[in-house]
């Protein structure tokens, strides 16, 4: 099963299955001298951890164990290996799907490709969103390394089911959405999302949603003009996330309904610098980052595993039957998915920042390490509940 690695210079390989002993990641290419602790990783992991309000009831502590690559709270330049042990596994929930593939899930395609006898039906195996633990761990490292360029990344849930944000949102509000149980950037929207989730849970159903991630102060010129355009790199990274079905940046598909005179973003002076009036392009032109806020969105489909009975095939006799999936599943995977999208944006940007020479390949100086640490601490302080930010 190839295709488990991402990136060229900052290279990430995830491993593990949903109901195996552990999931984890190996991160290769991290320069020496980056201040990094378990707490830095746990800060990001907490926002995708199950067992919280409105998400999967699986009670995982998600305690990262660093196996290599860090000494005295600094990276050594060698590969960083981190595992998270699976401590709340209940495989008995999945005995029925052993013979009844779930509609909307990867069960049947996996059986068709790898063979029934090789299929790990427990919790979806490698196709489970549990795999994204490794992405978020690597994303935490990437986010901290990007602090060298003072680049900040934060996301929120732009829509959930029929409810959506129809007003402007500040980056500070997006940062604070980390502490919203439904990743809403506005209090009134949070209440609407919560009502939808409660309704879906009662009905044994689920909802999809749209995640939006904003990158402040991205380095200029990241990406390459042809096959490695930044939009293409981000699209691949984000579309690789389980349950993601669509990607756009800037105005996205809306631009197809506009005239050139409407869609072209005028070039103006902004704070004594050259810039764009509205940032319609979402921070990418010609495949390169242009210094404006990098704005991407992606669509998450509704959780496939639901209690409502759905038609499927019993593989023992190839007859049609029904399945009602019993287990601990998210009523909306998009909620925890926001953190994963942030991580994939960070992994893409840090890899290109290293390719462009913005971030050193070998080591950070002591001064650079101190700058990174100061900015990271400011970032962590800025991520606080809405009430504390008086939103």
Swiss-Prot record:
Q: GO CC terms on record?
A: cytosol
Pathway assignment? Metabolic intermediate biosynthesis; chorismate biosynthesis; chorismate from D-erythrose 4-phosphate and phosphoenolpyruvate: step 7/7
The record ties this protein, via Pfam families, to: Chorismate_synt
Q: Does the keyword Amino-acid biosynthesis apply?
A: yes
The UniProt entry, under PROSITE patterns, shows: CHORISMATE_SYNTHASE_1, CHORISMATE_SYNTHASE_2, CHORISMATE_SYNTHASE_3
What are its cofactors? FMNH2
Binding-site list for FMN: 126-128, 286, 301-305, 328
- GO biological process, alphabetically ordered: amino acid biosynthetic process; aromatic amino acid family biosynthetic process; chorismate biosynthetic process
General function of this protein: This reaction introduces a second double bond into the aromatic ring system.
Q: Its family?
A: Belongs to the chorismate synthase family.
Q: What is this protein called?
A: Chorismate synthase
Organism, per UniProt? Answer: Saccharolobus islandicus (strain M.16.27) (Sulfolobus islandicus)
């Amino acid at each position: 099963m190839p295709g488990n690695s991402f990136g060229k210079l900052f290279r990430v390989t995830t491993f593990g299955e949903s109901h195996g002993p552990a999931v984890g990641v190996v991160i290769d290419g991290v320069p020496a001298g980056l201040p990094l602790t378990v707490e830095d990783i746990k800060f990001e992991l907490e926002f995708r951890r199950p067992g919280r309000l409105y998400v999967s009831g699986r009670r995982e502590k998600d305690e990262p164990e660093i196996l290599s690559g860090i000494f005295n709270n600094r990276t050594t330049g060698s590969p960083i290996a981190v595992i998270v042990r699976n401590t709340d596994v209940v495989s008995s929930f999945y005995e029925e799907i052993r013979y009844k593939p779930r509609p909307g899930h990867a069960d049947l395609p996996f059986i068709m490709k790898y063979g029934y006898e090789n299929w790990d039906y427990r919790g979806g195996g490698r196709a489970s969103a549990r795999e994204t633990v490794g992405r978020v761990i690597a994303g935490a490292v990437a986010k901290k390394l990007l602090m060298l360029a003072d680049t900040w990344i934060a996301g929120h849930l732009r829509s959930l089911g029929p409810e959506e944000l129809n007003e402007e949102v500040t980056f500070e509000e997006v940062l604070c959405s980390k502490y919203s149980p439904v990743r809403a950037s506005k209090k009134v929207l949070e209440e609407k999302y919560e009502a939808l989730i409660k309704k879906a849970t009662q009905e044994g159903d689920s909802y999809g949603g749209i995640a939006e991630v904003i990158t402040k102060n991205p380095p200029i010129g990241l990406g390459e003009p042809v096959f490695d355009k930044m939009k293409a790199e981000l699209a691949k990274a984000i579309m690789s996330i389980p349950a993601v079905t669509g990607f756009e940046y800037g105005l996205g598909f809306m631009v197809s309904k506009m005239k050139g005179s409407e869609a072209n973003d005028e070039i103006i002076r902004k704070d004594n610098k050259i810039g764009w009036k509205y940032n319609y392009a979402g921070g990418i032109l010609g495949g390169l980052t242009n210094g404006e806020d990098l704005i991407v969105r992606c669509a998450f489909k509704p959780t496939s595993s639901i209690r409502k009975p759905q038609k499927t095939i019993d593989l023992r006799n190839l007859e049609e039957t029904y399945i009602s999936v019993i287990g601990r599943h998210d009523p909306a995977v998009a909620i925890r998915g926001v953190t994963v999208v942030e991580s994939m944006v960070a992994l893409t940007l840090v890899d290109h920042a290293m390719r462009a020479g913005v971030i050193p390949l070998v080591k950070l100086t002591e001064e650079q390490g101190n700058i990174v640490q100061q900015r990271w601490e400011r970032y962590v302080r800025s991520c606080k509940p809405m009430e504390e930010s008086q939103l």
